[in-house]
């Protein structure tokens, strides 16, 4: 899990934090029957529900203390052997056939989970597909890897990504997919609309991923403990990929929802990276590894803990479907205010709520008229995959976007990035938006969709607020300067005269706004000094 996704808000911050005191000294992987694994995962969910109820009626310090959970296979799966004897006991040599020199295993799901499903006639419902990827994301397709939607020759209309799918986000996504399947008169969607949607979960690091999140995923059939391999054919594994079409959803109250509650099947890819490599690397797996295989029409990005509206994903997709020139879109970002807007009592939350509303009412609609939105928020945004792809020479929006990861790698190798680049790539999503609109010989536009919204947590404490804004201010300022310096790229794009003129007007507006932002910081600093 990346550092950017370390805080979740609400009671999740209490019950989903790792506690070293709960680690068992035993490091052996116990062989369990599938039904027993599922039962223990169910017991864990029941424990989580009871702990949440106790937390809601207790004081703040009690709510933030770690809860006592039932030990599951997921926990022992991540434990490393500390003694040579334990290590020897764990080793069981099995020879498995490779598929195109790659390790691919189809694992049956637990019997009790299988018995709770309505549709079981296809392998995607009865078997979890595991792939051990030993290559970098950019070489995923070239090394012969593939994905289930490609095997089934399914057209992927929507490709949805988020780093670690907590129940609040996942349940919201599954309700959106159920809404797509309810559109019986739509030419694209309908009862089988779920076959055109793939949900991708990218966990940033096997050792740091939250084990209780794995318990939830295991209860949905998306994950199984004990099948991951570290080395395949003397090559270290870079990522563990689990594919399953789940028919079960778990809401934020740890209640299981099935087809009787309107939940439809959802094609899911769970990519568990071996090492923590930050957010941009997770996006590299999403765009460069899985994207070329699935060839999706629209990619939707969701931040950790963001809950989309019940029809917001459809509202975003509809913009791309109606206008083939739309390369990116975003919806309204709303601050979670709690029951009866009680969070507004906190001045910090109230100020951020006002800021978000002003941005959604004034800034983004105005920029949408010109066709260029300075930033599509990563918490809830969508891109047309064809617009993001690089050209035959390897240059394009994604190439510029992933330079931020290369700068991060240079820091580990001793090479220092320049001051401008280091600050600019604190807001890499702004770079992506500019490069998309200024793409050579293309005329992609960005649009704001007010009918789509996503609710997200905002910092409620001053330290985390300052940390967030320091990153935003530095990144937005230097990314704005980058856009002005490279504004001449607009002349090489495929935009017509009228659109280029509108973009020129917006460029002048951005210059004035940048100057105002610079002097506003100086005024604030001088005020604080006095």
Curated annotation (Swiss-Prot):
Q: Where is this region: Disordered?
A: 22-94
Q: Which sites does the entry annotate for glycosylation?
A: 17, 118, 310, 474
**The protein, known as:** Chitin synthase 1
Listed under catalytic activity are: [(1->4)-N-acetyl-beta-D-glucosaminyl](n) + UDP-N-acetyl-alpha-D-glucosamine = [(1->4)-N-acetyl-beta-D-glucosaminyl](n+1) + UDP + H(+)
Q: Where are the transmembrane segments?
A: 477-497, 508-528
What does the annotation record about activity and temperature? Answer: Optimum temperature is 15 to 40 degrees Celsius.
Which PANTHER family has this protein been placed in?
Answer: CHITIN SYNTHASE, CHITIN SYNTHASE 1
Q: Which InterPro entries match?
A: Chitin_synth, Chitin_synth_fun, Chitin_synth_N, Nucleotide-diphossugar_trans
């Amino acid at each position: 899990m990346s550092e950017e996704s370390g805080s979740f808000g609400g009671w999740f911050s209490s019950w989903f934090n790792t506690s070293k005191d709960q680690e068992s000294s035993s490091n052996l992987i116990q062989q369990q029957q599938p039904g027993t694994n599922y039962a223990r995962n169910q017991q864990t969910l029941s424990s989580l529900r009871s702990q949440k109820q106790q937390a809601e009626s207790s004081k703040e310090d009690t709510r933030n203390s770690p809860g006592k959970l039932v030990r599951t296979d997921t926990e022992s799966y991540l434990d490393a052997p500390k003694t040579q004897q334990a290590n020897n006991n764990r080793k069981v040599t099995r020879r498995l056939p490779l598929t195109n020199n790659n390790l691919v295993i189809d694992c049956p799901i637990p019997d009790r989970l299988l018995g709770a499903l309505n549709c079981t006639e296809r392998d995607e419902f009865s078997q979890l597909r595991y792939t051990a990827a030993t290559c970098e994301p950019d070489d995923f397709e070239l090394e012969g890897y593939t994905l289930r939607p490609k095997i089934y020759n399914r057209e992927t209309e929507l490709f949805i990504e988020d780093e670690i799918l907590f129940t609040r986000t996942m349940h919201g996504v599954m309700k959106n997919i159920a809404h797509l399947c309810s559109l019986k008169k739509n030419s694209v969607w309908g009862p089988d609309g779920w076959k055109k949607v793939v949900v991708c979960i990218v966990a940033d690091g096997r050792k740091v991923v939250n084990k209780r999140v794995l318990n939830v995923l295991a209860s949905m059939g998306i994950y199984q403990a004990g099948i991951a391999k570290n080395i395949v054919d003397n090559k270290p594994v870079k990522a563990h990929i689990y594919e399953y079409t789940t028919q079960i959803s778990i809401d934020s109250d740890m209640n299981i929802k099935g087809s009787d509650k309107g939940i439809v099947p959802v094609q899911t890819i769970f990519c568990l990276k071996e090492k923590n490599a930050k957010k941009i690397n997770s996006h590299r797996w999403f765009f460069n590894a899985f994207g070329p295989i699935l060839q999706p029409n629209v990619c939707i990005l969701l931040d950790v803990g963001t809950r989309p509206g019940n029809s917001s994903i459809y509202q975003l997709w509809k913009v791309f479907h109606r206008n083939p020139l739309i390369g990116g879109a975003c919806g309204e970002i709303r601050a979670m205010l709690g029951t009866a807007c009680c969070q507004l009592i906190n001045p910090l939350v109230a100020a951020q709520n006002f800021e978000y509303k002003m941005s959604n009412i004034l800034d983004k609609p105005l920029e949408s008229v010109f066709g260029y939105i300075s930033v599509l928020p990563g918490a809830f945004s969508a891109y047309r995959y064809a617009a993001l792809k690089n050209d035959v020479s390897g240059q394009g929006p994604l190439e510029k976007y992933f330079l931020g990861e290369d700068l991060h790698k240079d820091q580990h190798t001793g090479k220092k990035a320049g001051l401008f680049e280091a600050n600019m790539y604190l807001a890499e999503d702004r770079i992506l938006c500019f490069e998309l609109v200024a793409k050579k010989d293309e005329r992609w536009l960005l649009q704001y969709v007010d009918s789509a919204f996503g609710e997200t947590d905002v910092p409620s404490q001053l330290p985390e607020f300052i940390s967030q804004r320091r990153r935003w201010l530095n990144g937005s300022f230097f990314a704005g300067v980058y856009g002005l310096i490279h504004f001449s790229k607009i002349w090489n794009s495929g935009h017509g005269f009228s659109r280029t003129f509108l973009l020129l007007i917006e460029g002048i507006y951005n210059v004035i706004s940048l100057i105002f932002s610079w002097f506003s910081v100086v005024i604030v600093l001088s005020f604080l000094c006095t």
